[in-house]
Amino acid sequence: MIKTKKIPQRKCVGCNEMKDKKSLLRIVRSPEGEISLDLTGKKNGRGAYVCHDKACITKAVKEKRLERALEKSISDEVYNKLLEDFDHGQQ
């Protein structure tokens, strides 16, 4: 019998859909409390996953889903930096 390899699934905090882990962006809160975009998926800290869609990120920000997932209040400056990093990652 052939074993099939499991593909890790994660839920997008914006649209609440389960998707492959590699198809999502990871936003991480480091142990020091710094919030950043994790392009490698290997940074240390608590992570939340979002689709590669600006609408999902905007919805996660607007409804404070990202704050709940990361268990930390997030300032507008950090949100703007995340959106800026997202835009640079798309190019």
Label for each model-derived stretch:
Residues 7-9, 17, 32-36, 90:
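N-terminal, polar/charged subdomain of small-to-medium soluble alpha/beta proteins
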Residues 20-38:
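Short recognition patches in nucleic-acid-associated and regulatory proteins
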Residues 20-23, 56, 61:
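Short functional micro-motifs and their immediate structural scaffolds
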